[in-house]
């Protein structure tokens, strides 16, 4: 059982619009740890560290380095997990830049950036890596390749689909399932965008694509 959203909890706690949630790992660790602990106490066995937006692009202008933010995020998460025996996941989202040819980010640069993120998570003591809310299968491929090159931790991969059963960039459930597992993901899933009613048929297709 995984945890729930961090962003919504931080908004309820008064996070200002435009603020970087990941910086709270350093500026207000008690708040972050308390949110993790609430999820763990409710029965979550995998807790995602507050590192979803920890990429060079999204942290541009921050006074903290990517490595500092990830180290603090994993530390907060592990402290909250310890009393409950839960696992601390390095939570990784899209980089915030479109890959070529739709954007300007080269595939090799994306692999390098994800490698930096994964190495920081490993150094901080993450128990696993969770790539989530991806809409571009090409970017997820870069992330998974980087993870396999830089760690031997379990890897979870999840994409966000629209009501028609495809991601924003046109990826189908089946293409995602086969590609992600082929690149070493230990588990695959669907998150964000839709509710349980809409996701359930897609989840069935996901399972059927991986006999």
Model-derived regions, located:
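Domain-level signal for soluble alpha/beta catalytic cores
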Residues: 1-211
């Amino acid at each position: 059982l995984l945890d729930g959203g961090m962003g919504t909890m931080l908004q309820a706690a008064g996070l200002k619009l435009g603020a970087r949630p990941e910086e709270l790992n350093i500026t207000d660790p008690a708040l972050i740890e308390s949110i993790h602990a609430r999820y763990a106490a409710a029965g979550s066995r995998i807790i995602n560290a507050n590192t979803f937006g920890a990429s060079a692009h999204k942290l541009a202008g921050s006074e903290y380095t990517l490595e500092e933010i990830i180290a603090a995020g994993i530390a907060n998460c592990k402290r909250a997990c310890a009393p409950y025996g839960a696992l601390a996941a390095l939570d990784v989202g899209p980089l915030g830049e479109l890959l070529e040819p739709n954007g300007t980010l080269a595939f090799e640069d994306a692999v390098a950036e994800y490698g930096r993120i994964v190495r920081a998570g490993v150094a901080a003591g993450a128990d696993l890596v969770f790539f989530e809310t991806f809409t571009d299968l090409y970017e997820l491929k870069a992330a998974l390749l980087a993870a396999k090159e830089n760690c031997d931790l379990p890897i979870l991969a999840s994409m966000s689909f629209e009501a028609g059963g495809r991601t924003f960039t046109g990826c189908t459930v089946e293409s995602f399932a086969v590609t992600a597992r082929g690149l070493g993901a230990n588990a695959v899933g669907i998150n964000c965008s839709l509710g349980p009613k809409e996701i359930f048929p897609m989840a069935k297709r996901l399972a059927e694509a991986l006999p």
